Amino acid sequence: MANPPHGGILKDLLARDAPRHAELEAEAETLPALLLTERHLCDLELILNGGFSPLEGFMNEKDYNGVVENVRLADGNLFSIPITLDASKETIDGLGLQPGSRVTLRDFRDDRNLAILTIDDIYQPDKQKEAKEVFGGDPEHPAVKYLYDQTNEYYIGGKVEAVNKLNHYDYVGLRFTPAELRLHFDKLGWTRVVAFQTRNPMHRAHRELTVRAARARQANVLIHPVVGLTKPGDIDHFTRVRVYEALLPRYPNGMAVLGLLPLAMRMGGPREAIWHAIIRKNHGATHFIVGRDHAGPGKNSKGEEFYGPYDAQHAVEKYRHELGIEVVEFQQLTYLPDTDEYKPRDEIPAGVKTLDISGTELRKRLRLGTHIPEWFSYPEVVKVLRESNPPRSKQGFTVFLTGYQNSGKAAIARALQVTLNQQGGRSVSLLLGDTVRHELSAELGFSREDRHKNIQRIAFVAAELTKAGAAVIAAPIAPYEESRQQARETISSAGTFFLVHVATSLEYAEKTDKRGVYARARRGEIKGFTGVDDPYETPQKPDITVDIEKQTVRSAVHEIILLLESQGFLEKA
């Protein structure tokens, strides 16, 4: 028998409401509808399938306050993370929502109706209290930033009725609901299951750790990685799942199973560890591995950890009896080359030689294409990582040139395009300011808002090309720092971004203007012209600065090439 669910009953709303499917689906079409965000979708999926048992909906004010203040629902059940549905006053008023109303919850991706919520209450949360009590209050914490920057001012509480399952098109066979996983364990005859939570690729140390934990408890292993929302910058779940699938045959035959969890992590450390334990209990696990700094977001800008290294272990241990799942606390394993084995650090005598590779070092080796030893990770795992993380010489990048009209941006961009094409190895795309204006932004004017929109269009195109491995050269005027920073953020999510300030002076650009556009602007024939009646904000932190008044185009291109070589994007001559 699998572990009983949290609260005693698995709240599988999909199964409960299946007999009323046609009735609920018809009603959902007649109700006002809320479009759910990606986080809402993750939360709703685990509400509907029972992963968040004993919840049957989004928390009302009593449950919310109980969880924030006392780590408990209003009925006394332990629960550590607020599961809330936020909405703006404008949306609430526009849909006419009030206590007692029924509202359809709709998937923003395909407009499918997923559930009907009967509203208990609509309330304004104390976000400051939520940030402090649940996450520790540090304004740099990703969940605190999300709370303040992306969460609407009102929460809507109430129970939901299931209309449809969420559609997934990836790894469908690995997306077990709690009921399905429990049935799977029963079919396999498993009665003791150690669950392992991860949002990272797994290597040999993780395999050793989970096998040790299972053998010590005469149990089997559930590898239960998160494939919903994790920490920004994490390796994508497609790569990670391929890693887990490659690793699975390295376990003793029949010991481990892989299941995917569509969870939106909050990176909430101690509170999140309790939540993770509840979720794994609902999925049938009897044991749960909690490691060092479990579900922590790393360090803040001062280099300080948001939580203590063992705060999460202590939190789960505190509520061990109520949780009804055994906590497996583990020490970090390290490799002993003399005996070719992994051991917990606290069991290694002083003076014994050890080896380890940090996450930073691993990323460096992947970036440079250098050797990753088999003692650290299995060849089949490394192969997957290399396919998804090619060395920089095979990665895309964007060189973004900014400067006045006639500063030399276009000449540098064209010359750089020719130089990169000569080098070969990747496609090269050129996004000149005039070309983009004609092809992508013909309807835009030159107001600050339209200029910003134009730069964001360039950034979107550049990001997609960069993601596909191209070298992108963009050369708009881009006069505003805010627009350039947003372009950097957009493109950096897909690859590496280099900002080149073409710092040719306004006087020189105007003096050498053969097209006469500056003269026309001075006469008032062109309005909103950068440098004449519209400002150019000097870049604060360019990656490189060139000046055609003081150097040749060839020299400027050479500086950019040297920068690309130094960062590993081009092979050194």
Curated annotation (Swiss-Prot):
Which intervals of the chain are annotated as region Catalytic? Answer: 170-394
Annotated region N-terminal: the residues are 1-169
List residues binding sulfate. Answer: 197, 199, 295
Q: Which residues bind ATP?
A: 197-200, 291-294, 333
Q: Enumerate the InterPro entries for this protein.
A: APS_kinase, ATP-Sase_PUA-like_dom, P-loop_NTPase, PUA-like_sf, Rossmann-like_a/b/a_fold, Sulf_adenylyltr_euk, Sulf_AdTrans/APS_kinase, Sulfurylase_cat_dom
What GO cellular component term, any one, is given?
A: cytoplasm
Which reactions does this protein catalyse? sulfate + ATP + H(+) = adenosine 5'-phosphosulfate + diphosphate
Q: Where is this region: Allosteric regulation domain?
A: 395-573
Site note Induces change in substrate recognition on ATP binding, residues: 330
List the keywords (alphabetical). Allosteric enzyme, Amino-acid biosynthesis, ATP-binding, Cysteine biosynthesis, Cytoplasm, Methionine biosynthesis, Nucleotide-binding, Nucleotidyltransferase, Transferase
Query: What activates or inhibits this protein?
Result: Allosterically inhibited by 3'-phosphoadenosine 5'-phosphosulfate (PAPS).
The places in or outside the cell where this protein is found are:
Cytoplasm
Q: Where is this site: Transition state stabilizer?
A: 203, 206
Q: What does this protein do?
A: Catalyzes the first intracellular reaction of sulfate assimilation, forming adenosine-5'-phosphosulfate (APS) from inorganic sulfate and ATP. Plays an important role in sulfate activation as a component of the biosynthesis pathway of sulfur-containing amino acids.
HAMAP family in the record, alphabetically? Sulf_adenylyltr_euk
The record's similarity note reads: In the N-terminal section; belongs to the sulfate adenylyltransferase family. In the C-terminal section; belongs to the APS kinase family.
Instruction: Give the quaternary structure.
Output: Homohexamer. Dimer of trimers.
* Name of the protein this chain belongs to: Sulfate adenylyltransferase
